[in-house]
């Protein structure tokens, strides 16, 4: 089994598994930021474009540069957001574009915990913001706030203890308010503030819950993909028994992200 590698390559599969929730969190994140209009934005790790689209629709930007190291994600986002205001680039956190005078706002959605060196990445972002500019990000609260993943890993590890190191909760200690605040403060940002952002995640049926785990994109789907058919069947059965549907057959859960923001000194 080689499920320790987080496979984030396939845009369509990501949309089914996580993208739909990412879009809703992106809206709440921007409502919290309340950014000034006509700003020049840089997005680090745009993925399939959930936050990119929200910035374009809700923040009235002058320009948006959205970058991601995955060519497949950049292609997916570019094809779904055809807008002259937005420029997509293939670039990682260690090779960020620059703008003369600096960007007004730099954001990163659901990315920081997957970076090899988050402190270096945040310092790099800070170095590309103008004085008085805003740096903000958000990550999933894997340890306590992502119910559909928390339940998945609880049952997966009960069946297969060797899966425990793949569980995003213990894997990503950065995804906690105190750790995020420390990360931003140590990067030299001022007025650092964290915020919880929570949405409902409703699945019409158990199959609607289970099917996205079969896409092979993301840590949990990558793990499922590594299992043989019998092991998948056992895990599916445990999850069905664990998840109590509502009277209409739907499964109603919640997902929480943790937002973090800070300013570059004027």
What is each stretch, according to the model?
Residues 3-7, 22, 48-50, 170-266:
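Conserved Class I S-adenosyl-L-methionine
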Residues 8-20:
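Class I SAM-dependent methyltransferase Rossmann-like catalytic core
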Residues 20-39:
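Conserved alpha-helix/loop element of class I SAM-dependent methyltransferases that forms part
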Residues 33-35, 59, 81, 129:
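A generic alpha-to-beta junction signature in SAM-dependent methyltransferases
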Residues 40-96, 120:
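Class I SAM-dependent methyltransferase SAM/SAH-binding core
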Residues 94-106:
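A short acidic, Gly/Pro-enriched loop at the edge of an enzyme's catalytic core
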Residues 104-118, 141:
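A short SAM/SAH-binding and catalytic strip from SAM-dependent methyltransferases
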Residues 119, 126-130, 134-204, 220, ...:
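Conserved catalytic/acceptor-binding region of the Class I
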């Amino acid at each position: 089994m080689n499920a320790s590698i987080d496979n984030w390559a396939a845009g369509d599969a990501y949309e089914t598994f996580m993208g739909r929730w990412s879009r809703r969190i992106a809206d709440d994140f921007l409502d919290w930021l309340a950014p000034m209009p006509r700003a020049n934005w840089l997005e680090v790790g745009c993925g399939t474009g959930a936050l990119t689209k929200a910035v374009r629709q809700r923040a009235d930007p002058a320009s948006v540069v959205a970058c991601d190291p995955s060519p497949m994600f950049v292609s997916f986002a570019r094809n779904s957001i055809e807008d002259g205001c937005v420029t997509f680039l293939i670039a990682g956190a260690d090779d960020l574009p620059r703008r003369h005078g600096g960007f007004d706002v730099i954001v990163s959605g659901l990315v920081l915990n997957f970076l090899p060196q988050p402190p270096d990445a945040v310092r790099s972002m800070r170095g590309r913001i103008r004085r008085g500019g805003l740096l903000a990000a958000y990550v999933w609260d894997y340890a306590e706030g992502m119910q559909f993943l928390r339940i998945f890993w609880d049952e997966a590890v009960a069946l297969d203890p060797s899966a425990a190191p793949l569980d995003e909760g213990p894997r990503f200690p950065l995804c906690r308010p105190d750790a995020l605040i420390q990360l931003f403060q140590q990067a030299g940002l001022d007025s650092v503030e964290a915020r919880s952002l929570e949405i409902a995640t409703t699945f019409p049926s158990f199959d609607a819950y289970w099917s996205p785990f079969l896409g092979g994109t993301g840590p949990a789907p990558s793990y499922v993909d590594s299992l043989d058919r019998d092991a998948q069947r056992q895990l599916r059965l445990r999850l069905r028994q664990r998840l109590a549907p509502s009277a209409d057959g739907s499964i109603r859960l919640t997902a929480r992200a943790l937002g973090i923001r800070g300013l570059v000194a004027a």
